[in-house]
Amino acid sequence: MRVTMLVRCLAMMRGGGETRHLAWARELTALGVNVEVISGVPLLGAARYPVDEVPATLLRSPYARDFVYRFQNRRGFGRLTMTALHVDEELFCRAAWRHIAAASQPADVVHAHAIHQAARLRAGDTPVVINLPGPPNKRYVSDLRLADALIADGWAADHLPAVVGRPVERVPKGVDIERFRPDGPSQRDALGLRDRRVVITVARLVPLKNVGLLIDAVARLHERVANVHLLIVGDGPEADALQRRAVARGVADRVTFAGNVPHADTAAWFRSADVFALSSHFDNSPNAVLEAMAVGLPIVATDVGGVREFVADGSGGTLVPGDDPDALASALKGYLTDAATARAAGARNRDRATREYSWRRSAQQLIDVYHRVIAARGRAARASA
């Protein structure tokens, strides 16, 4: 089977969606699937991340994501940023289909990551599978109905069928439990944090991730926990503003901005912490939470999107209301000042991640979806002949 994955930003940024598709591509290849990944680079720029783990083609097209993430929440820019995002995806998708159509060996399935137009713009009759990490803009609902299958997990798997008016296949994510394990190298000593109580977040620094809320919580927390320290792993257009916020809140010396860290190295950063925090406005089913669980950390997270799937029962973490820095600070304090409770929660998280989340199992479910859409399109072609 030949599968072509369209992952728009794989060469430009690494969030949960990009990480997931790399993991899928590796596992599918191990299961005997011939995988090609198509990603994009700017017309005049270069790739920011190497794409060398899987066979990949990088296509040049206008890249608007930096503009979108910087301005999407500013007053008066909403419509402009949505238009820019639409044009970005549309032009990349057209270029990808031209590449697919010209290939000497056609793809059996095209699997697009959150590229809503992928089925509408298809060349020929190749089946199209689209995975969705959250609620689509209303303008794309008719496009999504043209896909041969929609897949999702978390919040999206529960809510999208009503939005798009068709079934959505649930394909849960996985985690590399060998890489993300409690024992192994740590950055704590190198960062001079041996005697600190450390909170970590791993996120793109974009408005949706709301990392400013976590900085505000740490500003409140340091009055109650004298040696608290925050590690922020990730980069993005809000990095400078967040650094200024830490200065304004008087906690610049208690916050480390690590910038981008290769995904293969993030486990060592997780191991440097005592608790993981997520402060997003919305997160469908965040990879970073699952990776922190696998490392054996307790979780404190805003009760948004699909995060509840991981910590709803309270055994491995605590959910707090969104945009409430006092509640976030209080929940973090509970784990930072009670090592036994933190260890027990982390152990339960490690056990659950090991038992329930496997990239191999996730990839096998994908293959089942691919086989179904190939068979269904073949039946449709025979019926119309």
Residue locations for each model-derived region?
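Nucleotide-activated donor-binding/catalytic signature segment of Leloir-type glycosyltransferases, i.e.
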Residues: 243-261
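Short alpha-helical donor nucleotide-sugar binding micro-motif in glycosyltransferases
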Residues: 260-261, 268-273
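Conserved acidic donor-binding segment of nucleotide-sugar-dependent glycosyltransferases
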Residues: 313-314, 318-326, 334-339
